[in-house]
């Protein structure tokens, strides 16, 4: 095939991969873009796009002295978060999508979306974005190509992935890649003026597990449009992982170094906006302990001879801005200091800096809010959207672990599960074994957050392994993959712990200070792994004793810590019915091991409650 078949191609195609060229040519006929551009991933390209988007009104260049090479985007108010009701797993059989996903027949969905895709890039440029998941040095990397009509997405992809010519070279003339289609769904007729944030009221985010394809339409926001993120790194990768014998998980990866210089690696799964990023970038409050970040959101876990190893498939942080400050997350703030950051839906100060709720200091007397309106401290609405974001490269972080770029990953010593529970769940508990830990993860529940556009904030929702919106196939089979991995790994598998930073007293106060003081919990986790401390036996497992936590210099009353470490049997009993119904909801493919572990939990609750 010749490149002439790609109508509107700018210059020569920098690849001889026939599958890729044919796919692009077909997409051009469907989308009908004005031009087709292969991105190279260079700084010059990023700068050029930024200039164009500033001119178009999509981006605002921030104060060069305060935020060098940084920009603010304001999305359409209808396009501010993941849209779970419009997210589909289009497996051939409905039961393979399972009860936690929206399903549609693949061909019917492709027919439906093709109607929307037809001509949807008129008047726009189609960008060809090759990208690599994880370090580009991986001898057998997972690759992808996204076709998009959004420059904002291209700029975000340069931060969030290893993208451009290097990734295209990795694909080579015959390499395979995940095909990702994305259009904001806002064609331009000749002479029609563009809007600052093109999008469409009709939205689809669809994954095709059998063919490893991702099709997205109508949204320019984050995880709906940056298809390497949740769509590939979790939904499609979880399918690949099941087929190939590994795990794709919604987990941070943290390197913790004790005063003697020994390093430990922890993976942790928390629902969105439950402190995952803050833990990934923790600054320990215990003298002599330091931490480094390998990843803040996603971990790919593979068995090697001596244990379970984790790689971060991403290249950047896409963090929730509100609440981030020099007290809660100094590393995130310092990561943004050199600039090179893309902000979305935060507020703009009069001197060209950014601001959000929970930032250090008092709110400025005047701001422009995320909708572009004047804002003062007397205003009724938030200046920044609750799900506003910063997007910045990991290697800019002062706490980036050098292993972040090691394709073999880091050996995981412990896995943490944790949500946002005001009661019931103690501060930290070690599970009995891998099977017990799998059941605990399967029944993880948390309060709702603003990261989903449709959540009722504050209600409790089940979130198995914090993967509920991201499991790309049947959730029962996903849990089976956990059991299978444990059977394969045996005693090489890491210990699993359940944590809860969010326990409250009767008057509503938090019983645990959280943030940097969570290092005290991590130290106990390591002490348990090393066999240095005992534990209380509670209904949920081996729960820490207050006297075994390093509480030196902590202002929190010891009574609060002790209360945070309780696992009241009557509260666990209140959850039994709900948990039983949830396991039933997950369906007949839930492993027998999970059911037997739940039966054992019920027996412990009954015995303690008697």
Curated annotation (Swiss-Prot):
UniProt main location, coarse: cytoplasm
GO MF, one example: manganese ion binding
Active site residues according to the UniProt entry: 274
Ligand binding (substrate): 82, 221-223, 272, 387-389
Keywords: Cytoplasm, Decarboxylase, Gluconeogenesis, GTP-binding, Lyase, Manganese, Metal-binding, Nucleotide-binding
Pathway assigned in UniProt: Carbohydrate biosynthesis; gluconeogenesis
GO cellular component: cytosol
Compartments where located: Cytoplasm
Cofactor note: Binds 1 Mn(2+) ion per subunit.
Keyword Transport included in the entry's annotation: no
Gene3D superfamilies, sorted: 3.90.228.20, Phosphoenolpyruvate Carboxykinase, domain 1, Phosphoenolpyruvate Carboxykinase, domain 2
Residues binding GTP: 273-278, 389, 420, 515-518
Reactions it catalyzes: oxaloacetate + GTP = phosphoenolpyruvate + GDP + CO2
UniProt similarity note: Belongs to the phosphoenolpyruvate carboxykinase [GTP] family.
Task performed by this protein: Catalyzes the conversion of oxaloacetate (OAA) to phosphoenolpyruvate (PEP), the rate-limiting step in the metabolic pathway that produces glucose from lactate and other precursors derived from the citric acid cycle.
PANTHER family: PHOSPHOENOLPYRUVATE CARBOXYKINASE, PHOSPHOENOLPYRUVATE CARBOXYKINASE [GTP]-RELATED
Protein's recorded name: Phosphoenolpyruvate carboxykinase [GTP]
Organism: Corynebacterium glutamicum (strain R)
């Amino acid at each position: 095939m010749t490149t002439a078949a790609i109508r509107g191609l700018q210059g020569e195609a920098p690849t001889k991969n026939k599958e890729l060229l044919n796919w692009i040519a077909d997409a051009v006929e469907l989308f009908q873009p004005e031009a087709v551009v292969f991105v190279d991933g260079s700084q010059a390209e990023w700068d050029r796009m930024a200039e164009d988007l500033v001119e178009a009104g999509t981006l605002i260049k921030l104060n060069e002295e305060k935020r060098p090479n940084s920009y603010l985007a304001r999305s359409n108010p209808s396009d501010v978060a993941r849209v779970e009701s419009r997210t589909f797993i289009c497996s051939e059989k409905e039961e393979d999508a399972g009860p936690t996903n929206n399903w549609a027949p693949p061909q019917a969905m492709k027919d439906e979306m093709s109607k929307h895709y037809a001509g949807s890039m008129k008047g726009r440029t189609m960008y060809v974005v090759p990208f690599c998941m994880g370090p580009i040095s991986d001898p057998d990397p997972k690759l992808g190509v996204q076709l998009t009509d959004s420059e904002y997405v291209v700029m975000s992809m340069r931060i969030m992935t290893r993208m451009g010519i290097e990734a295209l070279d990795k694909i080579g003339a015959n390499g395979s890649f995940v095909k990702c289609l994305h259009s904001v769904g806002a064609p331009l007729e000749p002479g029609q003026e563009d809007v600052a944030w093109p999008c469409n009221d009709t939205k689809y985010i669809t994954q095709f597990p059998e063919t490893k394809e991702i099709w997205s339409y109508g949204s320019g926001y984050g995880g709906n449009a940056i298809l390497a993120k949740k769509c590939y790194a979790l939904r499609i990768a979880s399918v690949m992982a099941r087929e190939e014998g590994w795990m794709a998980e919604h987990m941070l990866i943290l390197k913790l170094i004790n005063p003697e210089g020994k390093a430990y690696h922890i993976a942790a799964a928390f629902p969105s906006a439950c402190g995952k990023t803050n833990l990934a970038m923790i600054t320990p409050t215990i003298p002599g302990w330091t931490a480094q970040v390998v990843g803040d959101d996603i971990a790919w876990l593979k068995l090697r001879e001596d244990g379970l190893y984790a790689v971060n498939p991403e290249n950047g942080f896409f963090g929730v801005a509100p609440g981030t400050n020099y007290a809660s997350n100094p590393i995130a703030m310092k990561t943004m200091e050199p600039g090179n950051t893309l902000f979305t839906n935060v507020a703009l100060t009069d001197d060209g800096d950014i601001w959000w709720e929970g930032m250090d200091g008092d709110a400025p007397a005047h701001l422009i809010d995320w909708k572009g309106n004047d804002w003062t401290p007397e205003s009724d609405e938030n200046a920044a959207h609750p799900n506003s974001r910063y997007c910045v490269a990991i290697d800019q972080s002062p706490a980036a672990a050098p292993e972040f770029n090691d394709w073999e990953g880091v050996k995981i010593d412990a896995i943490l599960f944790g949500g946002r529970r005001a009661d019931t769940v103690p501060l930290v508990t070690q599970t009995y074994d891998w099977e017990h830990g799998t059941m605990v993860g399967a029944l993880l529940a948390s309060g709702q957050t603003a990261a989903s556009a449709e959540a009722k904030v504050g209600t409790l929702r089940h979130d198995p392994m914090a993967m509920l919106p991201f499991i790309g196939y049947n959730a029962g089979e996903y849990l089976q993959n956990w059991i299978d991995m444990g059977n394969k790994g045996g005693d090489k598998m890491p210990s699993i712990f359940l944590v809860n930073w969010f326990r409250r007293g009767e008057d509503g106060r938090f019983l645990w200070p959280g943030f940097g003081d969570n290092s005290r919990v991590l130290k106990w986790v390591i002490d348990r792994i090393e066999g240095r401390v005992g534990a209380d036996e509670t209904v949920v497992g081996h729960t820490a004793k207050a006297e075994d936590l390093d509480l030196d210099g902590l202002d929190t009353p010891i009574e609060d810590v002790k209360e945070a470490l309780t696992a009241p049997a009557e509260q666990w009993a209140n959850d039994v019915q709900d948990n039983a119904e949830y396991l039933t909801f997950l369906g007949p493919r839930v492993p027998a091991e999970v059911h037997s572990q739940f039966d054992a939990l019920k027996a412990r609750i009954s015995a303690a409650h008697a």
